Amino acid sequence: YTTDDTAKFKADVERFAAALLGREPFASLKDRFSVRGVMKPSQERGCDEPTRGVHRNTALGCTFNSLGSERYLLTEDNRAIREAARAVPYDVLSIMVNHTRYGGGGIYNLFNTFTSDNQWSGYVFVHEFGHGFAGLADEYYSSSTAYTDFYPAGVEPVERNITRMLDGKPKWAALTSAGVPVPTPWAKAEH
């Protein structure tokens, strides 16, 4: 966001706060969350897109193609992040990038990133927030690589939302209502 984008930045903060706090479990707990935006103007809007030859002069140095993934959006400029973030107390740090391209990233207890202006931005924000806030794993149903490929046979994943059900039930079985099938069907077509 540039200085000229300040009004848009404020509106986007409100929009994404509503996207997060309008979904469970956050909707039921919204009195426990405080969302604040810190405007750190960039010289140019957007972010780097190295494989497309695009390099922007931005305050936080966000870039697509992180770790070799086209849509993975991260920054390595920890100093710039912490300088901007010190303006307010925080438990979770989300970096909103003024861009139309689909993408984001999330690293547990560090930060999460997302772009502001594509049809999936709200969904991506909540998804990446799950990584940064709760250390949740990806559950890409369309991926050719299953999360079970990342763990040796017989090893239960550390992430709270995935399981190999080594003892015949998911690790969250105590939180599941009676009669809920495992695996639980979901609204896959919406996503």
Where are these regions (language model features)?
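Propeptide-to-catalytic entry region of secreted or membrane-anchored zinc metalloproteases
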Residues: 1-83, 116
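Solvent-exposed loop/turn segments at secondary-structure junctions
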Residues: 1-3, 41-45, 99-103, 119-121, ...
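Short pre-active-site segment immediately N-terminal to the catalytic Zn-binding motif
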Residues: 6-9, 104-128
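Extracellular/periplasmic catalytic domains that process cell-envelope and extracellular macromolecules
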Residues: 27-31, 85-90, 107, 186, ...
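Structural recognition of the beta-strand scaffold that forms the well-ordered cores
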Residues: 34-37, 92-96, 124-125, 131-135
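Catalytic zinc-binding patch centered on the HExxH motif and its immediate surroundings
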Residues: 46-49, 76-115
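Catalytic Zn2+-binding segment of zinc metalloproteases
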Residues: 129-145
